[in-house]
């Protein structure tokens, strides 16, 4: 018999050197996350790019994988997809052949003690001009 889980996480990924590289390519970034979602074991509830240098995500994930392995998968695949879509834009910020996008660290918190509505309102009230079309 399988297990039933309801694991929700607030994940924040920050760009390398905290550069505002996501500014102007927001839709490409959102599309990359949606593409990774299709082939992975998580669901995006909400996502929002802030200041062009970090993205907030609310994810529902399976207990099959560890958080760190899922985050590494997300970071690796989105880096590849965004570079594939926006090489000229990203090469203005990152050079010497290094196809990087995210810093090694990340913030991740479970949402067990907080309702979806509270976290979603927090993310939506970050004054971002460009929101994801969910």
Regions found by a protein language model. Give the residues of each.
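Basic nucleic-acid-binding interfaces
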Residues: 1-134
């Amino acid at each position: 018999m399988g297990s039933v889980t309801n694991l929700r996480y607030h994940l924040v990924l920050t760009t390398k050197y905290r550069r505002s590289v996501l500014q102007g390519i927001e839709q490409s970034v959102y599309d990359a996350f949606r593409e990774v979602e299709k082939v992975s074991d998580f669901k995006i509830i909400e996502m929002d790019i802030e200041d062009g240098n970090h993205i907030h995500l609310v994810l529902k994930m399976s207990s099959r994988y560890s958080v760190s392995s899922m985050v590494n998968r997300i970071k690796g695949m989105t880096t590849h997809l965004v570079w594939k879509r926006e090489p000229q834009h990203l090469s203005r910020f990152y050079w010497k052949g290094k196809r990087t996008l995210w810093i090694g660290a990340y913030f991740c918190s479970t949402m067990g003690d907080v309702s979806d509505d509270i976290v979603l309102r927090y993310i939506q009230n970050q004054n971002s001009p460009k929101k994801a079309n969910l």
